[in-house]
Amino acid sequence: MSRYRGPRMKMIRRPGTLPGLTSKTPGTKVGSSDRSTSSKKISQYRIRLEEKQKLRLHYGLTERQLLKYVFTARGAKGSTGQLLLQLLEMRLDNTIFRLGIVPTIPAARQLVNHRHVSINEHIIDIPSYNCKPGDVITINNREKCRLVDRRDMNSLQKPEIPNHLTFDSKEFLGSVQQIIDRDWIDLKINELLVVEYYSRRV
């Protein structure tokens, strides 16, 4: 399954707010939720599937990419669900998003793909790069990033930077202090349902 590139508002109507995909929130038609819940009982499979889709859309992953992260989390010591979220949160594109430099993860991915991002003074053009404690992130094309910031986030309240990151807005420099804590992940998700979904399929 490829990465979704269609209208973002259309895709968040069912899963709800996905801050990584879009800063907008879905509207709800009067009576629509009542009809959907009362017409038929939602199966456990569908609940797990929708939670998996929420995770995939938020971080902008293909099905194959998400499955790879699930396998990696399974092979590590600790809670598979929490490790899965930490792996996704420490991606470079998500880290740039969480620093508040750009309003969405797709915008962060574009910066990385266009080679505007350096880590420890080396240009990195891989959005999935796994950021580690001690990494220093700089934006090479500072003027472009300021324009993106001014255009897309001027009317928005910038999110609080999580405790594992620091950001110097004057130098446009971010640093990774530690692995993110579960409490600082801003996506409302039940990661155990995602783990259960894959445990029944692979």
UniProtKB/Swiss-Prot annotation:
Superkingdom to which the source organism belongs: Eukaryota
Annotated Pfam families: Ribosomal_S4 (PF00163), S4 (PF01479)
Keyword Ribonucleoprotein: yes
S4 RNA-binding domain sequence ranges: 90-153
Chain intervals for the UniProt region annotation (Disordered): 1-41
Compartments reported by the entry: Plastid
Biased composition (Basic residues): 1-13
GO biological process: ribosomal small subunit biogenesis; translation
GO cellular component entries: plastid; small ribosomal subunit
InterPro entries: Ribosomal_uS4, Ribosomal_uS4_bac-type, Ribosomal_uS4_CS, Ribosomal_uS4_N, S4_RNA-bd, S4_RNA-bd_sf
Keyword vocabulary terms for this entry: Plastid, Ribonucleoprotein, Ribosomal protein, RNA-binding, rRNA-binding
Annotated GO MF terms: rRNA binding; structural constituent of ribosome
Compositionally biased intervals (Low complexity): 29-41
Oligomer and partners: Part of the 30S ribosomal subunit. Contacts protein S5. The interaction surface between S4 and S5 is involved in control of translational fidelity.
Entry's family note: Belongs to the universal ribosomal protein uS4 family.
Job of this protein: One of the primary rRNA binding proteins, it binds directly to 16S rRNA where it nucleates assembly of the body of the 30S subunit.
PANTHER family: 30S 40S RIBOSOMAL PROTEIN, SMALL RIBOSOMAL SUBUNIT PROTEIN US4M
Protein name per UniProt: Small ribosomal subunit protein uS4c
Organism: Aneura mirabilis
Gene name of the encoded protein: rps4
